[in-house]
């Protein structure tokens, strides 16, 4: 059937997504199609969040993350992060993240955050060339309507559907 196997174990897993979310359903189906092309069987499983949570540490889930804050990097990849569903535990990465959070200025946090993502010197990090603790599938574009006479300032990328990123710089709008 084209699915690769090693020692009798097929490269196959379930991928959970909230059945109430048609975008995640489509992403799960497309991801499964792409993985099949390289010999991996992904079975999308639509369910309620109550039914998904028991699987959050044992099976992939199509989460909807996204934030312009590095706090999210900490929560998703630090061994003590509440969103570390991959159960990733690396003392070096934890040290970088702890150093970044303890920095006295935002500027001083940049380098340890970068090293947590990828440290060329040690060849470690959570980015795709390293541990790749998350598979980033897509950034969803947001569509906003704008009233004539309002000039909305330059926007940075907007994360997942909550957070009201649109108004982060409302003080720079020209009304």
Label the model's feature ranges.
Residues 1-67:
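Ligand/substrate-recognition segments at binding pockets and active sites
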Residues 23-33, 52-175:
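Detector for C-terminal structural segments
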């Amino acid at each position: 059937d084209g699915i690769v196997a090693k020692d009798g174990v097929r490269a196959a897993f379930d991928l959970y997504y909230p059945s109430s979310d048609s975008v995640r359903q489509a992403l799960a189906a497309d991801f499964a199609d792409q993985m099949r092309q390289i010999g991996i069987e992904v079975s999308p499983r639509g369910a309620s969040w109550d039914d998904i949570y028991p699987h959050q540490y044992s099976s992939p889930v199509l989460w909807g993350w996204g934030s312009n804050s590095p706090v999210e990097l900490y929560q998703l990849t630090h061994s003590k992060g509440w969103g570390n569903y991959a159960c990733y535990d690396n003392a070096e990465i934890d040290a970088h993240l702890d150093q970044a959070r303890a920095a006295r200025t935002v500027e001083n946090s940049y380098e340890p955050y970068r090293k947590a993502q990828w440290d060329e010197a040690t060849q470690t990090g959570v980015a795709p060339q390293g541990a790749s603790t998350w598979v980033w599938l897509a950034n969803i574009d947001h569509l906003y309507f704008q009233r004539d006479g309002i000039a909305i300032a330059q926007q940075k990328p907007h994360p997942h559907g909550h957070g009201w990123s649109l108004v982060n710089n409302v003080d720079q709008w020209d009304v």
